[in-house]
Each structure stands twice: as C-alpha cells, then as structure tokens.
Amino acid sequence: KSTISLNRDDIYDDSWAVIIGIDKYKYSDQLKYAVKDAKAVKDMLINKFDYSEENIRYLTDEEATLSEIKLALDDISTSADESDRILVFYSGHGETQKNNDGTETGYIIPIDGRQDKPYATGLAMDEILRTCQMSNAKHMLFLMDACYSGLMTENVKGLSKPQEEGYLSKVANENARQIITAGGGGEMVIERDEWQHSAFTKNLLAGLDN
C-alpha cells in the first residue's frame, strides 16, 4: 500500500487550505462528484490532520465564482507565515488554451466560467501561482483534480502520480511549491458511481487514510 502523510510532526507551525469543488456549472457540462470530492478532502484534513476549520476557505458550486476563488487564495496566502504550509485542492473543469508563441496556459473554470472562453472567464494557473508566491509559507501543495496542460512554471515542480508511494511524505519537508494534476490537456476526469468520487480523489483519499 502507498502511504501519504500530511501530519505536521513539528515541520509546520500552522496549516492553511483552499478547497474548491464545482458540480453545477452554468455554461459547462455538469459534474457529479466534485463537491463530494471537496467535502471529503476538507473532512479528512480537519478530522485526521488537525487542520483548523477557520484556516480553511471552502467554496462549492455557487460560492465558487471567479472573484471568490481569487479572494480565498489571496486571504490564505497573506495569512500564512514562513513556518506554515498551504494546500490548495480544486475539483472541477480545467481548460487549456494554446498561445501564439506555442506555449499553453492551464485554467480552472469557476461556476460561471465558460470552457470556450477560458482567458475571459477562467482563472489561469499562472495567476494562482503568482498570488501564492506572495506568501511567506514554507510549502505549498496544489492538488488539481482537473485535466489540462500548461500548468507548470519554472519554479514549480510537477508531480502527476498520486498513487506513487509516499509522494506527499516525500515533498512535505521541502521548501517548495508543487502541483499534482489528474491528467494532461485533452484528457477527461474520470468519475464513477461505484466510487462516488473521481479517480484522482479516490486514490488521494485512500492514500491519506492509510
């Protein structure tokens, strides 16, 4: 069995999180288990890993507008100190836009966003990272349960295999910003009724529960 650890063990003074889950999109295909994914991650952080509920910004469906997501990220980023850590979990639609220079930009799509207009209505991962880079936090981990490419920047390590043994334990001690995504551009997030979760979050929760 793979083992994932989020225990503080004197590594961090405090823990902060932004957790977002969107099912009921206004202009995109609706999802079934993104909100359930978000709630399960939130509950596990609180009940097993001693995250304080007041240190978690939790946005689902109609709460997860573009402005509210940006405010939550800014609030957490400016609240965390240099001995703290930040976890950002997003479950919902992602989109990739190809740029004129051949690069790609990954976006998360808020409740009222449009996948065919990601630049105008979505939130670019670059912007999320810029906001969080203003933070003094020792460690930031982005768990993105969405499929898109164009996520990685020079100062961010990408990890794409949540089933990899001990992957969260391995990165927890590093002073770094890291991203784990459900898949690359053009792939689909897998949800199944038998799981009541996406494949990404199912594997994540199983690892955290060990």
Which residues make up each language-model segment?
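A short, compositionally biased domain-edge/stem linker segment
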Residues: 1-8, 165
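Caspase-like (clan CD) cysteine peptidase catalytic core
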Residues: 4, 14, 66-91, 95-157, ...
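Short, conserved active-site loop motifs that form the nucleotide-linked donor/cofactor pocket
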Residues: 15, 56, 177
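Short glycine-rich His-centered loop
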Residues: 15-29
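Active-site-proximal C-terminal subdomain of hydrolase catalytic domains
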Residues: 21, 45, 60, 137-210
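Glycine- and acidic-residue-enriched helix-capping/strand-helix junction motifs
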Residues: 25-39, 43, 191-195
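Signal peptide-proximal N-terminal region
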Residues: 40-55
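Short beta->alpha junction loops
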Residues: 56-66
